[in-house]
Amino acid sequence: MAAHFVLNMQPHPIERFRRFLAGLYETAHLDALLVPLGSSDGTTIEPRIVDNAAELAAADPFAPVMILNSARPALDYQQAHPDRLLGVVMRACELRALTTLHERGAIDMDRIVAIGVDCMGTFGPDELAWRGSPQPLAEEALQFARQGGINPYRYRPACQMCIDPMPNNAAITVDLLGLPARKAIVISSSEQSARDFGLSNLTDGHASSDMVEQHERVRQQVNARRSRARERLLQALNGELAMDVDSLAAHLAECETCQTCLSVCPIFEQFVADLANVTRDETIQWIMACAGCGMCEAACVDHLPLARIINRVKATITEALAERMPANG
């Protein structure tokens, strides 16, 4: 059974959520927490490790800015401190990458407390530079959470195509979609996790069924909207580039001297034995495990639409596998 709690966000939503995180840091007995953190000059934000609750005064998990997939620093931390308990505040695509790392034996999820935040989409560093600060972007995200966010075309292409913005495989979820997030949001977990982490003491009572149902309704609307955007973006690729496994593998081979797109992928190295000789089978496994974060496309110095290409190739592989499955009966 799921447990749903309301978190009243007034009068200062971001500060209120920081207090929730600080309380959770203590009740979960965390050794450290990986969370989006603003820079000292307030001009940028990126996932960073904090090892005391006081540092959460600069945390801002609602800023729709993605500089890197935080599954990578989570992996780095656990490799350096395998016995410590790490909390992570992540978006859906970051949690998907973290899950893949666990499945590949790279991360021990028993030493992770995952806090997943609804994602309405993210901007890259260019939008952040234009705004000058992540704070107005965070405030805008909360303002429009009730209707599922702003028009998706403003976000990075990978976010426009994401049809699963809900954080799965998280011990705790921060539910924003469909809710008046500047006033109140929902904190959800299993009943066991709620007891383990003392969520009833960190929140403001049980959430109403109306709030829970509204969140689910808007989630479905957002998924449908993203599906339409995905089809539009993939159709726009027609004739632009060869989009099959062999073409992508050949492209990766040509990029051997750069590999910037591969270095930012949090899971690529888990599938490839020799970076100088990526095989077709390794390429297929990597594509099928793609978390959809789009960091590869953001990093590509040739500005290739890699997230869209990978999305198309993944769909093609999935269709081919489905055709090989024997029909029931």
What is each of the regions a protein language model found here?
Residues A229-A253, T260-G329:
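Ferredoxin-type iron-sulfur electron-transfer modules in oxidoreductases and energy-metabolism complexes
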Residues M1-E240:
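Iron-sulfur-associated redox domains of electron-transfer enzymes in respiratory
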Residues G149-T173, C255-C261, F268, A273, ...:
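Cysteine-cluster motifs in flexible loop/terminal segments that predominantly coordinate metals
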Residues Q10-F17, C258, C293, L306:
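Generic structural signal for well-ordered, non-membrane alpha-helical segments
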Residues H102-G105, C255, T316:
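Alpha-helix boundary/capping residues
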